[in-house]
């Protein structure tokens, strides 16, 4: 478990943190099944994933609040980006977050526990350790407490990034680039 990991934050969808990550990584959250422990009507998973920083997920129960991200198979996960805005959300802003990973809900292990101080923008949580990506079927983000002892939480967006892998890395056949072979690449 890592406490108080290296966290960077910024505030727009076109900000440098997001652009730098998207150059070398791919957003894999779209392949997952998302669920939340509770939500106010009109502030659910759809708002958490709609790429609109004006909408948000709002919990509606006692803490801790959970966001569960389940992939159909084990994935290599590099970064988790969470967007919070203290200026807009005040006591709804999370201040203590736990990230757990595993294959199913019953074998989750805490990998990161971090405390945030008035976060405003994208919070980049690296999930690769010693140059090895986290490999998991399931991620769970737990909000343990909010600023100013708030009860419900607001999170505006979450993005999950994995390695960008080219298909050439998975083919077992060598590349044939000689003129003799290229003559037979197409049919007339």
UniProtKB/Swiss-Prot annotation:
Keyword Nucleotidyltransferase on entry: no
Entry GO terms, CC: anaphase-promoting complex
Top-rank lineage group of the source organism: Eukaryota
GO BP term, example: anaphase-promoting complex-dependent catabolic process
Localization per Swiss-Prot or TrEMBL: Nucleus
Pfam families (alphabetical): ANAPC10
Recorded metabolic or biological pathway in which this protein acts: Protein modification; protein ubiquitination
UniProt entry tagged with the keyword Secreted: no
Principal subcellular localisation of the protein: nucleus
Sorted UniProt keywords: Cell cycle, Cell division, Mitosis, Nucleus, Ubl conjugation pathway
Residues in DOC domain copies: 4-187
Family the UniProt entry places it in: Belongs to the APC10 family.
Record note on quaternary structure: The APC/C is composed of at least 13 subunits that stay tightly associated throughout the cell cycle: anapc1, anapc2, anapc3, anapc4, anapc5, anapc6, anapc7, anapc8, anapc10, anapc11, cdc20, cdc26 and cdh1.
PANTHER family registered for this protein in UniProt: ANAPHASE-PROMOTING COMPLEX 10 (PTHR12936), ANAPHASE-PROMOTING COMPLEX SUBUNIT 10 (PTHR12936:SF0)
Function field: Component of the anaphase promoting complex/cyclosome (APC/C), a cell cycle-regulated E3 ubiquitin-protein ligase complex that controls progression through mitosis and the G1 phase of the cell cycle.
Name of the molecule in the record: Anaphase-promoting complex subunit 10
Record gene name: anapc10
